[in-house]
Amino acid sequence: MIVCAEMDEQWGYVGAKSRQRWLFYAYDSLRKTVVAHVFGERTMATLGRLMSLLSPFDVVIWMTDGWPLYESRLKGKLHVISKRYTQRIERHNLNLRQHLARLGRKSLSFSKSVELHDKVIGHYLNIKHYQ
């Protein structure tokens, strides 16, 4: 059971900035760890894949920013929309940008393939949060 889960998405790109790749993930505020993550486009389908990974965790309170798809997907659940309550996951986004150069907005480092992009970021999350 997770009492408070923060959800957010982070932008990255593969090859060119026009080829966007999004990391969607959920962060347990109390345990200070990533619970689940998925990669894809910034669509309801990608958010749905993340929600299906989170369904066994029985999250009590969802905390997100103001992206409209969160509101429509979390309808009927205890959902708080606030920048104040998403500070931890936003800080984690900054840490990811500092540790992984390919997530930097203005960087010479970038991924050349979708598979490599997902594997590098997924491996980092695996080492830092899942083991």
From Swiss-Prot:
Keyword Transport: no
Biological process according to GO: DNA transposition
Keywords: DNA recombination, Transposable element, Transposition
GO molecular function: DNA binding; transposase activity
Function: Absolutely required for transposition of IS1.
Family membership noted in the UniProt record: Belongs to the transposase 27 family.
Protein name, entry field: Insertion element IS1 protein InsB
UniProt organism field: Shigella sonnei
